[in-house]
Amino acid sequence: MIYVDEPGYIIDKMTRNSLYFNHPFKDEIIGDIASIKKTTFAHLKACHDLFYHPSNMILVVVGKMDVYIVFSEIKRNQSQKQFKESILIKYLDFKEKREVKEEYSETSIDKSYNLVSVAFKMEPLDDYKGIERSKIEKTYDILLSMLFGGSSLHNKKMLENKVYNDYGGYEYSNFHQMFYISVSNYNVFDIDKYVKDIKDIASDPEKYLLDEKFFEIQKKGLMSSFINEFNNLTNLSLEISTLLADNNNFFDQLEIIKSITYNDIIKCAEEFKKAKITISVVKGNKND
């Protein structure tokens, strides 16, 4: 098993299990020997038929081409295949609690470094759709960059105080009945100081936002990252298809970023303060 003993996988699994009671996000993603052995042909066939059904696919073709020739060839190819009727995709019916399942979890590994993840269980964004939802997501992109990015007060403080020796990172995931933010570092020397600083920021994020000038810098950084997607056809096609699946238009995104104001950042910061927190720690017990 190439994943079971991998530190990053271990802390990710701990975080998911600590955040959620019932959401399938907490379930095993990669699997272990025991769970894989239970997989049957019927399971694989059901997944294949759903995943590759035309009603569940978005095809994005990027590059210089004759659009009509390309799509004619696609239609010809697909018409030769036999598909069942359109498969209706249903969300699992479950209720997720507002609280986190565990506020703290810890384990140890045979490594010489400590991994720490501080995760925030947010209110899901299910009530927001299209452009409105995309704007909220991008506002959080900027907010998190201001609070925990490479140029943030947090990162400078952690490096100066030798809490860690290299910048870690942050991420967020937003799906049906699920929205969480995670700040993590995989080489923490002082776990208590690292966790305390993140919790202090979460309790009063406005204090750490610096000013509107810093906001404009981070906003331009997000715009630059978006424009850079055009330089990589693989990333571009992935971004377009992901947005289409969420009923969003890729070509609206730049204007959405431009429309974000400092007041939008403050609103998201207020929501961030309401999050429920869980801390996951993987301690290294090996000395170099």
What are these regions (language model features)?
Residues 10-34, 56-62, 117-125, 155-207, ...:
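M16 family metallopeptidases and their MPP-like homologs
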Residues 1-6, 50, 193, 200:
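Active-site-adjacent, His/Asp/Glu-enriched structural segments that form or flank metal-binding
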Residues 21, 29, 34, 53, ...:
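An aromatic/glycine/proline-enriched structural segment found at the starts
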Residues 74-78, 143, 194-202:
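Short amphipathic C-terminal alpha-helix that caps PH/PH-like domains
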Residues 36-40:
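Short, charged, amphipathic alpha-helices and their helix-cap/turn boundaries
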